[in-house]
């Protein structure tokens, strides 16, 4: 019996050993598979990091003379810079308001473009969040400076019409020219853009229309609780709400949904590296800050002469102040954005064109307009959001038309032509419109 039990025990031990070996092999294979998976993921991350390298801007080593050369002499538009000092000379020697206004208007044009350039250079060193705030602040600094000078002089209607004209110009003329030029270059197809972003922007513009529409309706229906004061109180309250909404929009754009607002290039890795190299700043951070200060001071100086000459230019040229404030001034302030939007559209980067045109309209309607109401509140000026019935209706119809054109998420040269023709109708309407506040107040 004992002899029979020995082989059985041996067989049991052999089976146990083989089972242990199988378990060890399976564990070893699992560890090996996990190691290979980790290595593969690391290799994939490494390949991604090499394909899309983190680009850090390299500060150029410029001298003062080289910085002056880059900012002043490397842009053909700066050939118009001498018109600014010439306007000041004409003001003191001839005192012709019409010529002072015209020369100042031309002299401010390159300064507005250089302000945008200096802002972009400084944004290269600050990162996307602060850079976005800089662009939001200095993107329409020319209109803000002109508006503050006019507000200081009590010319509330000039402030309202200038800001309104800038919104209309960006939505119709700038966007229309971008659609038209981009459509001519790519005439065989419809250019596409992000429909979701366009919907959010249209909603913000409609909110701005709401803030401007209700004080006008309250005024013309004579339904104020306290005549004269309820309209102003509503405007100031709505302005604070609009500023909060704009701050939330900036957070949404720069933080919460930053990926949606920074579309990736659909080109190859080589184009990605090329675009990263193009974003390297041309001047240093402190040079950009100094140039921003100089250009802002120069724009402020010329804006004072410009505002003083508006009424005289209107009389000498026999042109309504409403047309000068709504059409001529915004075209100068939007000159840089106009060129940038067209350039992006001709490169089939329509999201950037919309960011320039519609984004600037949002900045003015949701930031500049309520900001001027708050500044006027501090100055003791009774600026409100009642832009009068004609102007408010013009803004409302324009926003509806633009939102209708953006709802499909595509554009062509015909849509651009329609927007340009709409702007011509707006310009003609303001040319024959008699402003009830002829004194600018």
Curated annotation (Swiss-Prot):
Q: Name one GO molecular function term.
A: calcium:proton antiporter activity
* Coiled coil segments of this chain: none
Membrane topology note? Multi-pass membrane protein
An example of a Gene Ontology cellular component annotation for this protein is: plant-type vacuole membrane
Topology Cytoplasmic: residue spans: 1-69, 119-129, 188-196, 253-286, 333-354, 406-412
Task: Report if keyword Transcription regulation is assigned.
Answer: no
Extracellular topological domain: 91-97, 151-166, 218-231, 308-311, 376-384, 434-441
| Result for mutant: residue 226 to A | No effect on transport activity
Functional note? Vacuolar cation/proton exchanger (CAX). Translocates Ca(2+) and other metal ions into vacuoles using the proton gradient formed by H(+)-ATPase and H(+)-pyrophosphatase.
Q: How does activity depend on pH?
A: Optimum pH is 7.0 for cytosolic pH.
The answer to keyword Nucleotide-binding applying to this record is no
Name of the protein described by the UniProt record: Vacuolar cation/proton exchanger 2
**One Pfam family from the UniProt entry?**
Na_Ca_ex
Write out the annotated subcellular location: Vacuole membrane
